[in-house]
């Protein structure tokens, strides 16, 4: 978008926010859930170019009368395994979008344990264009342990092939916490590869100095 177009949009948004110009869309008479102040606010919500520009009393080119219905931010599921549901991404979206979930962060380590990179590619391809935003964390532990028999083994060099995909956010739950704290070479290669990305953790019983070692390995979150 050109700089002049951005400036023009800003001028329009400011005028609409001040009530000097009609919004393109207004949700009228809603019970607005304010998740910051834990309040329910009765009023209108003005929208311009897909962006909320004001809450209060507004008029719009198009108005939708909510008549006291609740208006709230949608939910984001920060960690989910789509394949655990035994349905496709499209069917999964049909089940959760009507219930207010519009974004999920998927860790496809179950399908990857069976189909490897092809399983991850399937999730990425089949979730394209859905009314649900699907982001992916690449599975860090395929297989989960060396004692398992799996359909694939994913090393750092395999994950590298997908890490720059647009909807890939980082490295999925690092269940192999012994590998982290004991400096396993394969595990350290993955942690190094994703050092500038989000790395999810999964260390339910780790504590004290081992926990310190786990965290300095680059783990950003905890599954439990």
Where are these predicted regions, by residue range?
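Histidine-centered divalent metal-coordination motifs
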Residues: 76-83, 171, 200-202, 223
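Functional cores that coordinate and move charged inorganic groups
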Residues: 185-193, 199-224
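Divalent metal-coordination and catalytic microenvironments
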Residues: 30, 50, 68, 79, ...
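Histidine-rich, glycine-flanked metal-binding segment
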Residues: 4-74
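Di-metal (Zn2+ and/or Mg2+/Mn2+) metal-binding site signature of metallo-dependent hydrolases
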Residues: 69-92
